[in-house]
Amino acid sequence: MSESEQRPAIAVAHVILHTDRMDASARFVRAIGARPIFEGPKVSVYEMRGGTHLLLMLQDAVVAGAAASFDLMVDDLYATHERFASLGLAPSPIEARPAINHEVFTVREPAGHVITFFSSHASGKPI
C-alpha cells in the first residue's frame, strides 16, 4: 500500500469537557452519539469515531456560554441537525462557512459549553 493509502500515523487521543452537571452532561454526550467506556462521579470517558476519547471531568464551576475547546464532525450535517432537534437539543440554524467549504451548527451542552458541529471534511482515504 502506498503511503497516501495508509491511515495517518497520529490521531487525537483525548478531548476534555469540564462540567458541573456530570449526569446531565453524560446524558448529552450519549445522546449526540458517543459510546460510554467508563462513567464515574468525577470522570467519565466516551469513545468517538477513530478511537478519540471525550473525557467529562467534574469541576466546581463552569463558565456558561464559553466555546468548547474542540469541535466535532459528522457525516450528514442535516440529518444530525434534525435528530438533535428531535431530541430537544435546540441546535442553531445551519450556516455556511464558504471560506473553509463547510457548513456548521452549534449546540449548548448542559454545563453551558457551546459545541460546533461541522460537515465532514474527511479526504476519502483511510482514517
Question: Model-derived features: where do they sit?
Answer:
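Short beta->alpha connector loops
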Residues: 40-41, 76, 97-98
